[in-house]
Amino acid sequence: MILLIDNYDSFTWNLYQYFCELGADVLVKRNDALTLADIDALKPQKIVISPGPCTPDEAGISLDVIRHYAGRLPILGVCLGHQAMAQAFGGKVVRAAKVMHGKTSPITHNGEGVFRGLANPLTVTRYHSLVVEPDSLPACFDVTAWSETREIMGIRHRQWDLEGVQFHPESILSEQGHQLLANFLHR
């Protein structure tokens, strides 16, 4: 079962739908509706941290979940979840040079992890005004994808199964979103 932590964002349900279409059993819980003990009792096999309209500091249990389950369970962070992943390990989340709300843009990636087998460059949909500051990215992460302006669009932990994407693979305008999520689901 995938535990999908909802950071009060409607895109959470797009992620839910995509994972269900891929055959996953998914349980959605709001970021303020469960504890780490509750999660232990649920015994998820994977965790997804959803997008949201706030900063990682305002994302309920999301930061604690990443810190607690890093190295224990595979975790995928999407948009806010991606930012929370970097911040949980000491990275800084800052205002983006340009607000991207409902905009598509090409990204380049390294072809590994969730990007395995995907087009390169890949057109994705972005809904964010914050980004991970490149100079602050903890050394335990590799940058796996970047925009034309070199903003970080994907990260992966060097040792543990933690991966984040700044964009929205669950948006209908993103290319190969199902495949990206399948790459996370089936590893």
From Swiss-Prot:
Its EC number is 2.6.1.85. Gene3D superfamilies: 3.40.50.880. Inhibited by 6-diazo-5-oxo-L-norleucine (DON). The inhibition is competitive with glutamine, but uncompetitive with chorismate. The keyword Metal-binding does not apply. It catalyses: chorismate + L-glutamine = 4-amino-4-deoxychorismate + L-glutamate. GO terms for biological process: 4-aminobenzoate biosynthetic process; folic acid biosynthetic process; L-tryptophan biosynthetic process; tetrahydrofolate biosynthetic process. Disruption phenotype: Cells lacking this gene do not produce 4-aminobenzoate. Keywords: Folate biosynthesis, Glutamine amidotransferase, Transferase. PROSITE patterns: GATASE_TYPE_1. GO terms for molecular function: 4-amino-4-deoxychorismate synthase activity; protein heterodimerization activity. The active site is at C79, H168, E170. Pathway: Cofactor biosynthesis; tetrahydrofolate biosynthesis; 4-aminobenzoate from chorismate: step 1/2. Residues 1-187 form the Glutamine amidotransferase type-1 domain. Changing E170A: 150-fold decrease in catalytic efficiency. Changing C79S: 10000-fold decrease in catalytic efficiency. GO terms for cellular component: aminodeoxychorismate synthase complex. InterPro entries: Anth_synth/Amidotransfase (IPR050472), Class_I_gatase-like (IPR029062), GATASE (IPR017926), TrpG/PapA_dom (IPR006221). Part of a heterodimeric complex that catalyzes the two-step biosynthesis of 4-amino-4-deoxychorismate (ADC), a precursor of p-aminobenzoate (PABA) and tetrahydrofolate. In the first step, a glutamine amidotransferase (PabA) generates ammonia as a substrate that, along with chorismate, is used in the second step, catalyzed by aminodeoxychorismate synthase (PabB) to produce ADC. PabA converts glutamine into glutamate only in the presence of stoichiometric amounts of PabB. Monomer. Heterodimer consisting of two non-identical subunits: a glutamine amidotransferase subunit (PabA) and a aminodeoxychorismate synthase subunit (PabB). This is Aminodeoxychorismate synthase component 2. It comes from Escherichia coli (strain K12). The gene is pabA.
